[in-house]
Amino acid sequence: MKKNILFFFYFLAMATLSLKAQEIRPMPADSAYGVVHISVCNMREEGKFTSGMSTQALLGMPVKVLQYTGWYEIQTPDDYTGWVHRMVITPMSKEKYDEWNRAEKIVVTSHYGFTYEKPDATSQTVSDVVAGNRLKWEGGKGHS
């Protein structure tokens, strides 16, 4: 019985170590850049939710993607680095990244607000926004 218990804990320890030793992969050139696509993105010291927060990135912020392990390690334009969940950025090629940076933007100046599907506050909410968020200008159709 003691052997079985020891074997179980040995197996559990090995399984835990293998999960922690995830393969770190540098990003291929066609997705080594990205843009944050949530209003406030928590950047963490390690690629896990329980890790401490190192800084934050805002919607529309262009970032460099350094590596991927299930989480992205990113670098902001002001050279901060941290880990973000894979669902909070849109990875892209250098060409798309440069296109994003050249595009005309709208910068949110209110403390908090919303974007809508149509130019009507009763239409479906697309996202919340906070001061400093950057949105690509798509034109003024339907706006007064």
Give, region by region, the residue ranges found by the protein language model.
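Start-of-domain marker
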Residues: 28-58, 66-68
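Bacterial Sec-dependent N-terminal signal peptides
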Residues: 1-27
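Boundary regions of SH3-family modules and the immediately adjacent low-complexity/disordered segments
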Residues: 22-31, 48, 59-64, 76-114, ...
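Beta-strand-connecting loop/turn residues
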Residues: 39, 69-70, 140-144
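Generic hydrophobic-segment detector
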Residues: 8-11, 50, 122-123
